[in-house]
């Protein structure tokens, strides 16, 4: 089976007309959830994915609300709760130079320009102006590294290694 990537988790239904409430886990929800696009539903107790075509998409509070072709009522989508939406690897778009997908960054080892290993990126937060990488070290403590040019000096996806310049107070 082709490699697939998570783009969202279904947390609930919304209204009575077959909308579902999704927490996006993708870098590009507007692109991933575009009308006409295909996503694959992996339900909690099912091994086989269900192919779904997006009929509508809108933002509501912190959620993405989706409707799928062929689903017109709450009774048809209730079973999807707690399901995960994925896309195939072939659906990924090529990024510009120095742009990366989250799955390429998560798992990379972070080292300083002095060669000190800080740990592995376990999560990426998107609080606002720039992403923040959560780095867990051998001491199990989490360090927050902002993805900005002053800090991140080199990203080598092939070697799964990221070099950073430690600014004063960054690791305190």
UniProtKB/Swiss-Prot annotation:
GO terms for molecular function: ribosome binding. Residues 97-170 form the PRC barrel domain. It is found in: Cytoplasm. Keywords: Chaperone, Cytoplasm, Ribosome biogenesis, rRNA processing. GO terms for cellular component: cytosol; ribosome. GO terms for biological process: maturation of SSU-rRNA. The keyword Coiled coil does not apply. The keyword Glycoprotein does not apply. Signal peptide: none annotated. The PRC barrel domain binds ribosomal protein uS19. Binds ribosomal protein uS19. This is Ribosome maturation factor RimM.
């Amino acid at each position: 089976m082709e490699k697939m990537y998570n783009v969202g988790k279904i947390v609930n239904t919304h209204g009575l007309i077959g909308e579902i409430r999704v927490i996006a886990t993708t870098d590009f929800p507007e692109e991933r959830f575009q009308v006409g696009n295909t996503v694959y539903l992996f339900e909690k107790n099912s091994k086989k994915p269900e192919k779904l075509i997006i009929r509508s998409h809108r933002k509501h509070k912190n959620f993405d609300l989706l409707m799928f072709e062929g689903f017109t009522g709450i009774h048809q989508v209730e079973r999807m709760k707690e399901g995960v939406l994925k896309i195939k690897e072939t659906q990924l778009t090529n990024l510009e130079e120095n742009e990366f997908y989250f799955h390429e960054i998560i798992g990379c080892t972070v080292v300083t320009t002095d060669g000190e290993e800080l740990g592995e990126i376990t999560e990426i937060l998107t609080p606002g102006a720039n992403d923040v990488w959560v780095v867990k070290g051998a001491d199990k403590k989490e360090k927050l590294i902002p993805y900005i040019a002053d800090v991140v000096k080199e990203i080598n996806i092939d070697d799964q290694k990221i070099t950073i310049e430690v600014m004063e107070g960054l690791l305190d």
